[in-house]
Amino acid sequence: MDARLLEILVCPICKGPLHYDRAAQELICNADKLAYPIRDGIPVMLVDEARQTVEGTPVDPAGPAGS
């Protein structure tokens, strides 16, 4: 995932930052607890395509899958 693209993409709901989960190929919004898929290297930023993340388990942007 291109670092420049990650800098400009935001959650379509809250406009908050997204964190790249390399292993799952998803962009995560911790505020809304949503994960947006990345398909063939293209982020799918449609709310209908997002999945709910596990409640109470925020993605750590500094972790192994962090941006």
Swiss-Prot record:
S-S pairs: none
SUPFAM superfamilies: Trm112p-like (SSF158997)
GO CC annotation: cytosol
PANTHER family: PROTEIN PREY, MITOCHONDRIAL, ZGC:162634
HAMAP family in UniProt: UPF0434
Similarity-based family: Belongs to the UPF0434 family.
Name of the molecule in the record: UPF0434 protein Bcep1808_2639
Annotated organism of origin: Burkholderia vietnamiensis (strain G4 / LMG 22486)
Lineage, broadest ranks: Bacteria, Pseudomonadati, Pseudomonadota, Betaproteobacteria, Burkholderiales
